[in-house]
Amino acid sequence: MNRMRWVGEGDIWDLDMSTPVTLEGTARAVPDDPLPLGLSRGTRLSRPKQVEFFHRFMASPLIPSFSPIRPNTGDGGGGGFSLQRVLTLPFSNNWLVSLLGQFDVQRFVTEIDKTKAFGRGSSSTVASRLNTIGKHLKDKSLYALGFCSEFLLSPDDTLLLSYDAYKGDLDKNPRAKAIFNHEFPLHNLTAEAVWPGLFVDKHGEYWDVPLSMAIDLASLPAESGPSYHLCLHHNSGSPKKLHSDTMEVPPPSLLPGLSLKSAVSYRTNMDLWRGTTPKLETCKPYDVFLSSPHVAVSGIIGSVMTAAFGENSIRSKFENDSEGVGGFSLHFPSVNSGFMADALGRASLTAQYGNFQKFFFDLTRFHARLDFPHGLRFLTGATSVAQDLLNSRQPSLEAFQKICPEVLVSLQQQIVGPFSFKVESGIEIDLRNGANPVTVDKTVFAIEYALQVLLSAKAVVSYSPKQNEFMVELRFFET
């Protein structure tokens, strides 16, 4: 219903993370200082629309997923393998209603195995076993239902309303969301209310916030030039770790309160090499955005200012700041508020071989990204190292640690035709850990199927070993 806009891989603002934990299929990054902002992401199809696409155009009547946890399962948070199916009702060209159903296959099999009819050495008849299966299929705790209504209010305005219920109970611990999006010629305006809001922190842990509301005004991603974000975020209620009975300390930014973030950045690109071999005229590339061999570098510099009012005041983040992470900061205890400003930077390298047109091995793509999210820490560390070297002194490990970037690398290789394999991983550098200063974290493996007829779209089957999650999804205009 709404036109797609391309999300560039070099854009500095974080995207929502895909996750099968909920029916909606996404989790927002926990806001931090300076990044993530908390509401900054690319346009994507809603989960019901993705599932409907697989049903209609890819001959997939059931969509599988796996997650070790599920909301409100009532069995200690256990998840497992599940299947999804959607029913859509297009009432008009401007109004689409969908009902997304999810069946917990793993729990169903587990419950069946516990019954006497399927026990070891059982002499039950076929009729008895079928009766047992039918009885368990009626167990509403095996099902989750998601109602979604999408309105195209105007060519530039959309409204999405969703209501998800688990264990077949529409009133017990539901998850609801309302999203309004307006597209200006050069900007996107998004207003969102979620109850509860699902967030994921940097350790991969999920948190529920009883009520989360946000308004985001963002300029569209550009190949080069300035961009900005204005983000107003309000939390209400005490956050709780998903499927945890213990009272754990939540990230400060999820506590009740109001925060306002203003971020500006400038991006520049430079081609080191671009292939001149003519493309095949007899066939189209599998993906138009992956059809040009090249080697390019890009850089982003920017700054973020944050004002917080309430329990989510940024004061607690600086009291425990042992590494000098925080930038310029002020705190006003009398009104329970604070202010912070910091700089940030990013450098990236992309190298691609092949036009992604031939049937075999016509695409090899490598991407490396260095993030410097705390400009003041980097500046103080670089200054300290430079002074020590000029004075013929050995720089300290603490100074070197401050200038170490956050690293993300990805490699994509065509296998056959539109199929390609992709692996993405973060690299953490901790020079103070002499035994293991470099660790690989947040690795994700994926098989991608390029949908050639849609120019730049792909069906993605991904697996995250850290979170033990498996998911099938549809993505548009993303590299």
Curated annotation (Swiss-Prot):
GO cellular component labels: chloroplast; chloroplast envelope; chloroplast outer membrane; cytosol; endoplasmic reticulum; membrane; plastid
Keywords: Chloroplast, Endoplasmic reticulum, Lipid transport, Membrane, Plastid, Plastid outer membrane, Transmembrane, Transmembrane helix, Transport
Location(s) in or outside the cell: Plastid, Chloroplast outer membrane; Endoplasmic reticulum
Subunit details: Homodimer. Forms dimeric beta-barrel. Interacts with TGD5.
Domain of life (superkingdom): Eukaryota
Annotated function: Involved in lipid transfer from the endoplasmic reticulum (ER) to plastids. Specifically binds phosphatidic acid (PtdOH).
Name of this protein: Protein TRIGALACTOSYLDIACYLGLYCEROL 4, chloroplastic
Gene name, Swiss-Prot/TrEMBL: TGD4
Domain notes: Amino acids 110-145 are necessary and sufficient for phosphatidic acid binding, while amino acids 1-80 are only necessary.
PANTHER family for the chain: EXPRESSED PROTEIN, PROTEIN TRIGALACTOSYLDIACYLGLYCEROL 4, CHLOROPLASTIC
GO molecular function annotations of the record: phosphatidic acid binding; protein homodimerization activity
